[in-house]
Amino acid sequence: MGGLWDDLHIFAMDIMTIKSDRIHIYILNNTFMNKQAITLLFMLPVLTAGAQNPIIRGIYAADPTARVFNDKVYVYPSHDIMPPEGQRQDWFCMADYHVFSSENLTDWTDHGMIISQENVPWGNPEGYSMWAPDCVYKDGKYYFYFPDAPKEGRGFAIGVATADSPEGPFVCEPEPIKGVMGIDPCVLVDNDGQAYIYWSGMGIRGAKLKANMKELDGELTELRFPGNANAQAPNIPPILVGGQAMEGLPEGFKEGPFAFRRGDWYYLTFPWVRGDTSNGQNPTETLAYSMSRSPLGPWDFKGIIMAEHDNTCWTNHHSIVEYKGQWYIFYHRNDYSPSDDKRRSARVEKIAFNDDGTIQEVFQTKRGVGISQATSVLQPDRYSAASDDVSVAYVDTLDRFQGWQVSLPKPGSWLCYSDVDFSGVTKGNAMVRVKACADAEFSLREGSMNTGTVIARFKVKGGKDASKGEWMTLTAPLEYTPKGVTDLAITCELGAVDIDWVQF
């Protein structure tokens, strides 16, 4: 865009808010050297993310709860942020919630913020404790369940907000649910319309909800903390707790329950630390599950759905949903913050069941799920398979949301990026963003690593740009155009090359 934009210098640190169709920006006026607040109004597309893992780019999105509403998948994650100065340093810090949706599990739309800690009537407006949420539909209304730190007292409470649309606007109830003291709410609406709520806090608990979806159906029990009989903590008042502890779960730390029904089986899934913590070790969480013929158990522990992360991300948190005949598991890890496991990002994989209802183990991938359009920007660093010498690094370590680059270090190096739809390709060329420090050659092929039909060939000439290893965008004519959905392979044939993206 020309005109106004030619004269403005907009700094990333000066952007205050991006919401809906408005961008609120502070602009440094070079003439008067002061800050002026303006609002630029555009009909902007809402932010989207691509098909690969992580599925959300631009913000941290942990604890993803996926639900199917109106033939779309909606994801309700928590929103990790960097701690404000003096607040919750080196700990989880979350001040609001966003909601995302997709019709193809490839293109994700951010519908913006739906609830902030500042508009929860009973919550601490500076608590930064809006952890894992859930959202369900019943009788024409959408019910959003979320934990928060209360203004009065200690610990967590769980509140409810309602809306007429899965995207909001949501209106918070004036008080949290009585008898639910904890985090990680999950609500299961059974086939007969009865709703159940599960949460973690003093173990994993579950309870029936009343028809209004805002109250527990049952008596509350007075629970006294051990500190009441201890001179070190004599003033901790008892609390009223509803529901019941879930029986039949394994020993060890558990949180984040997610319950669902498939056929006649009920599943209670949860993050679980299966390692030994008694010797000072700090093993990370697995995702595990139990099964029952009843929504509140007793439960029969079955095992692991997903093993521990292969990095230092201590937590995992998930949801499981069926969409268009396929089951998926949504989870998180710290892809964009490798040295900080308090800033996490949502991922998704396919999940499968055995004939007896048990769940097959799921393995984490870069590629994730969904079909990528060849006409979109493809990120080969999210490959499905690769030779052992291929490596991945951030494009910009100061802005990790720019994603990754992949390095093919020598002739014979290869990678495969699965499920690319070429049906929309009308141009006669391919584009790549690459860098190399010397002459390099590589090809794009259909299918397997080095035996598939060549789609396009690229040559990077040594010289000024190559010797500096600077990024450049190259174009090459198509020698062949695949039909429909197929795999894309990239093979290195001379030298070494780094690739950021590919597009047809």
Per-segment meaning from a language model:
Residues G50-F504:
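Carbohydrate-active catalytic/glycan-binding domains of CAZyme proteins
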Residues M1, W5, I10-M16, D21-Q52:
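Bacterial Sec-dependent N-terminal signal peptides
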